[in-house]
Amino acid sequence: MARTDNDTWDLASSVGATATMVAAARAVATRAPDAVIDDPFAEPLVRAVGVDFFTRLATGDLTPTDLDPDATGGAGNMDRFADGMAARTRFFDDFFSDAADAGVRQAVILASGLDSRAYRLPWPAGTVVFEIDQPGVITFKSDTLARLGAKPTADHRTVPVDLRDDWIGALEAAGFDRTEPSAWIAEGLFGYLPPEAQDRLLDQITELSPPGSRLAVEGVVSSPDADDEQIRERMQAVRDQWRQFGFDLDFSELVYTGERAEVAAYLGERGWRTDSITATALLEKCGLQSAEDSSANFADVRYVTAVK
């Protein structure tokens, strides 16, 4: 089903299902030899969502080889996807670690999905971690982790609000202090936002961030219309590939393509000092194999860090 202005979802449908897909990939990556991440909550959270396809992936009952027996290495190859999510996860984990080392004690996770950093990272004493996502997603994850006996490793405050609504008011009501430096992440979010919503969100973060604040973003690079069509074709090919295993979701209906601001440049114009790394370079930095050609990727992304 195509996106609408006020659409909602749970973790088994629409955009929410992509959060479960990413958590399943983190579970696969956690089991890998010489794993670059350790997310012990990924598998149980995926199992709790109850999408059979993702549960089988997360538990190892369905292997990457099962999904791609001919080893085509395309966008539906779970080994490559899990490696990509492992590198991405490590990037944002390291970002929070660096921010903590710099003395930042406020962290904000935008559209947190099944992110478990509030429970698995070694936060310094006095750190407050805010998680923002749709109310149903927040409630499900909090209840599931409580049943598992998981305890946050920081002062954990959930903010159940859609980013299209008054999330700033909800964040401040939860205790966020805009006069103190903060560390923000937007992981796997911008592709699901229209270009103008991306700009608005970056402006809002800038407004809430005094000097010393930090931001890490997975930015989607603008592409010509012809490239957009290729991206949609790859997404539809993955849908066809995975449908035989009982999972049917057209990813191409969930994303917004077309021209959008380049994140590093946009932030630089608003007083941030930025640095960026390509997905390929990030994989290599983590000791993981990068895709041999762009057909293995849904889109071209840059991982951006910024300091104010």
UniProtKB/Swiss-Prot annotation:
Signal peptide: none annotated. The keyword Protein biosynthesis does not apply. Gene3D superfamilies: Vaccinia Virus protein VP39. Disulfide bonds: none annotated. Pfam families: LCM. S-adenosyl-L-methionine binds at residues 133, 162-163. Its EC number is 2.1.1.-. GO terms for molecular function: methyltransferase activity. Belongs to the UPF0677 family. Exhibits S-adenosyl-L-methionine-dependent methyltransferase activity. This is Putative S-adenosyl-L-methionine-dependent methyltransferase Mjls_1073. The lineage of its organism: Bacteria, Bacillati, Actinomycetota, Actinomycetes, Mycobacteriales.
